[in-house]
């Protein structure tokens, strides 16, 4: 008796055990923004992505720790008092600053990632956050972020700073800055508690410029004479700091400044994340 050929299904079974089901990739950001349910493998319940927001804040200079929220826990407590429900349990990444703002620095566009437990309209999130922020802190902008994207803290690659300087004329500072940029290396040390960290400052400097500042008539003797702008890299092994650049301006290979270079103020203009335009 003639046997019929095997069916396609039987051919697959005869090759061996069936392959594990393929988990579909996360949906694009638009799906999260509109609140559509994330696809799930067969046998698993569909999951609604947690709403994730990226806040941009203007922070004043703080000279005493604790004057304003700093760590993730302090920000989480402040936001919860606004009536916003944060996702998950305390201490599990519900709120994450991109990078800590050093004491004495002004932050013009500091980044804070927030994961909420419920999806809310953008206007409502904005108004609740603004109502919860202490008076010196300003919400500059916010937008939703695809939940699968890297956290801001893991994506910081550089930062832009603006430094007001006094005590030395801008042309003299500019010559010193040019010597730093021409150097192949700038060995430096940082001292913290009982530890000393040796690093090379030169590869951390992306760009550096000096502009003259014309003080108004009748300005104080310590009025700014120059404005330093610098972009510094953030690396896993070392982070560029503007105060390191200022101290290097007065040391070899830079020429003598002929006076005491004083810092009047430092502003972190913005943090650059992976993929940001220059």
Feature locations, PLM:
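Ordered, amphipathic secondary-structure segments that act as subunit-interaction surfaces
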Residues: 108-162
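Core RNA-modification/binding signature centered on pseudouridine synthases
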Residues: 2-26, 47-50, 64-65, 182-278
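Short, low-order "capping/linker" segments at domain edges
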Residues: 149-167, 269-278
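Short, charge-patterned binding micro-sites
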Residues: 85-117, 147
């Amino acid at each position: 008796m003639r046997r019929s050929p095997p069916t396609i299904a039987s051919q697959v079974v005869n090759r061996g055990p069936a392959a594990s089901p393929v988990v579909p990739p996360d949906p694009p950001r638009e799906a999260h923004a509109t609140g559509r349910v994330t696809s799930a493998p067969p046998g698993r319940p569909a999951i609604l992505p947690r709403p994730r927001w990226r806040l941009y804040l203007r922070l004043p200079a703080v000279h005493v720790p604790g004057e304003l929220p700093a760590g993730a826990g302090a920000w989480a407590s402040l936001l919860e008092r606004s009536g916003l429900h944060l996702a998950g349990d305390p201490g599990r990444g519900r709120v994450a600053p991109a990078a800590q703002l050093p004491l004495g620095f002004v932050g013009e566009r500091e980044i804070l990632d927030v994961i909420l437990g419920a999806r809310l309209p953008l206007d409502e999130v904005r108004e609740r956050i603004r109502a919860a922020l202490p008076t010196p802190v300003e919400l500059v902008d916010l937008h939703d972020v695809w939940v699968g994207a890297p956290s801001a803290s893991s994506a910081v690659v550089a930062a832009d700073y603006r430094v007001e300087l006094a005590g030395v004329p801008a042309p003299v500072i500019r010559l010193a800055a040019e010597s730093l940029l021409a150097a192949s290396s700038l060995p430096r040390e940082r001292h913290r508690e009982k530890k000393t960290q040796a690093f090379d400052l030169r590869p951390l400097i992306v760009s550096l410029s000096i502009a003259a500042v014309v003080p108004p008539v009748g300005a104080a003797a310590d009025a700014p004479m120059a404005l330093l702008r610098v972009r510094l890299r953030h690396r896993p092994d070392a982070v560029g700091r503007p105060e390191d650049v200022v101290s290097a301006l007065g040391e070899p290979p830079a020429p003598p400044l002929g006076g005491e270079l004083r810092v009047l103020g430092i502003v972190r203009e913005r943090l650059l994340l992976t993929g940001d335009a220059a």
